[in-house]
């Protein structure tokens, strides 16, 4: 769970809900003032609903947190002068930093995206109830901004599957053995992802209570492309595919706000941009270096058997499969998101001592942009 290790806050809040108090030793918590709406004011007051008082702090790569309410999943969002509760979009004004003041207290700070030097803290407008949260630049020696966490509800984080060795290349057992359609699958990596960043038919409010963290599993295997018995000295043209279908690319983007770049690296949207470092580290993937998305491409390639005896050849390409799971392990995307990477291909052969076929002309015949 590498992405959780990136927190530089002194308060380990990623594994529990906390009841956030407005300032040290206050009896009045933060709560969502209009819990039935997707957005609303964040107030310091006596709350009528318990869930409105509890928040989970989702950590990001750089140590900041996204503060989500247990009742409906809405998050702290900065506006011109105050902080409200709104739907998570990945806006810079939805990322806060916990800054330690004493062993028991801290304050929440937000960076003004228009100014690198403008750091503001959250402060109740007044000590009269109810009171909205406003920004203040008065940070030094200001006790009104101090917060303490109380009445914690511990979460059970999903158990991530153990990583496995990379998939082994299939081995042919005879001249008539075409090999398996797929090799055995290997789990390469997996990572936690907050429920506010994924798409599921379960309501966001229900997700916050039952599966606040999902996980994404990255699996690899060898996918068969073709198989043929090559007579001695024969040449054959074979059709091969690479990339990802447009349907899978769109579904993956909708499901986890992540897509696959043309270089097979991952491209992160606004919602997941803050966890891209931990995500790629955990799943053993890379961040894309291109703005172009991966497409599905069909090739024809010529192969020649240079041996003076018949050889069975079966061509394989490495497949990377991504699946989204709830905390109980239930898979959300019933059809996995699969990318075929033709930078990694192999040809199984029988007899085993035969040489690989000689590669001739390669021609792109279709891609999903045409």
Curated annotation (Swiss-Prot):
Subunit-level organization: Forms a heterodimer with BinB. Upon toxin crystal solubilization with NaOH at pH 12, only the 63-kDa (binB) and 43-kDa (binA) proteins were detected.
Residues of the propeptide: 1-6
Task of the protein: Component of a binary toxin active against Culex and some Aedes mosquito larvae; about 1000-fold more toxic against C.quinquefasciatus than A.aegypti. This subunit alone is active against C.quinquefasciatus, Anopheles gambiae, A.stephensi and Aedes aegypti mosquito cell lines; non Culex mosquitoes are less sensitive to the toxin. Binary toxin internalization into host gut cells requires both proteins.
A molecular-function term among this protein's GO annotations: toxin activity
Record lineage: Bacteria, Bacillati, Bacillota, Bacilli, Bacillales
Family (UniProt): Belongs to the toxin_10 family.
Keywords: Disulfide bond, Sporulation, Toxin, Virulence
Disulfide bond residue pairs: 31-47
Start and end residues of each stretch annotated as Pore-forming domain: 156-370
Gene that encodes it: binA
Regulation: Toxic activity of the cleaved 40 kDa form of this subunit alone on cells of C.quinquefasciatus is decreased about 50% by chitobiose, chitotriose, N-acetylmuramic acid and N-acetylneuraminic acid.
Domain of life, per lineage: Bacteria
UniProt signal peptide: none
Post-translational modification: Processed by proteases extracted from C.pipiens larval gut; 6 amino acids are removed from the N-terminus while it is estimated about 20 residues are removed from the C-terminus to yield the 40 kDa toxin form that is seen in insects. The 40 kDa form is 50-fold more lethal against tissue culture cells than the precursor form. Larval gut extracts of Aedes aegypti and Anopheles gambiae also generate the same 40 kDa form all of which are toxic in C.pipiens.
Chain positions covered by the region annotation Beta-trefoil domain: 1-155
Compartments, as annotated in UniProt: Spore, Perispore
The keyword Ribosomal protein is assigned to this record: no
Name of the protein this chain belongs to: Binary larvicide subunit BinA
Record remark: domains: Has an N-terminal beta-trefoil domain and a C-terminal pore-forming domain. The trefoil domain has barrel and cap subdomains; the cap has 3 carbohydrate-binding modules while the barrel is involved in host cell receptor binding. At neutral pH the carbohydrate-binding modules are accessible on the toxin surface but the barrel subdomain is not. The crystal is very stable at neutral pH, upon ingestion by larvae the crystals dissolve in the alkaline midgut.
One BP term from GO: sporulation resulting in formation of a cellular spore
Pfam families xrefs: Toxin_10
């Amino acid at each position: 769970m590498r992405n959780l290790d990136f927190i530089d806050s002194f308060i380990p809040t990623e594994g529990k809900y906390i009841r956030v108090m407005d300032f040290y030793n206050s009896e009045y918590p933060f709560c969502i003032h209009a819990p039935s709406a997707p957005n609303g004011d964040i107030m310091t007051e006596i709350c009528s609903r318990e869930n409105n008082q509890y928040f989970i702090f989702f950590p990001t790569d750089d140590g900041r947190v996204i503060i989500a309410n247990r009742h409906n999943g809405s998050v702290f969002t900065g506006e011109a002068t105050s902080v409200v509760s709104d739907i998570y979009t990945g806006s810079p004004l939805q990322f806060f930093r916990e800054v330690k003041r004493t062993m028991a207290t801290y304050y929440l700070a937000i960076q003004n995206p228009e100014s690198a030097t403008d750091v503001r803290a959250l402060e109740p407008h007044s000590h009269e109830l109810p009171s909205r949260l406003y920004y203040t630049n008065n940070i030094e020696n200001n006790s009104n901004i101090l917060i303490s966490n109380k009445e914690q509800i511990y979460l059970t984080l999903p158990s991530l599957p153990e990583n496995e060795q990379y998939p082994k290349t299939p081995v042919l057992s005879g001249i008539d053995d075409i090999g398996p359609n797929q090799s055995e699958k290997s789990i390469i990596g997996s990572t936690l992802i907050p429920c506010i960043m994924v798409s599921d038919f379960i309501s966001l409010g229900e997700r916050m209570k039952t599966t606040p963290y999902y996980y994404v599993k990255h699996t690899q295997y060898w996918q068969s492309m073709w198989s043929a018995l090559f007579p001695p000295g024969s040449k054959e043209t074979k059709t091969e595919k690479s990339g990802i279908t447009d349907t899978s690319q769109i579904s993956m983007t909708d499901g986890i706000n992540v897509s696959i770049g043309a270089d097979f690296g991952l491209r992160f949207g606004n919602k997941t941009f803050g966890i891209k470092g931990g995500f790629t580290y955990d799943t053993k993937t890379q961040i894309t270096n291109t703005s172009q998305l991966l497409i599905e491409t069909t090739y024809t390639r010529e192969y020649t058997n240079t041996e003076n005896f018949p050889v069975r050849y079966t061509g394989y390409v490495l497949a990377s499969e991504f699946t989204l799971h709830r905390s109980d392990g239930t898979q959300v995307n019933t059809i996995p998101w699969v990318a075929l990477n033709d930078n990694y291909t192999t040809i199984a052969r029988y007899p085993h001592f035969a040489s690989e076929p000689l590669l001739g002309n390669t021609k792109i015949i279709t891609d999903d942009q045409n």
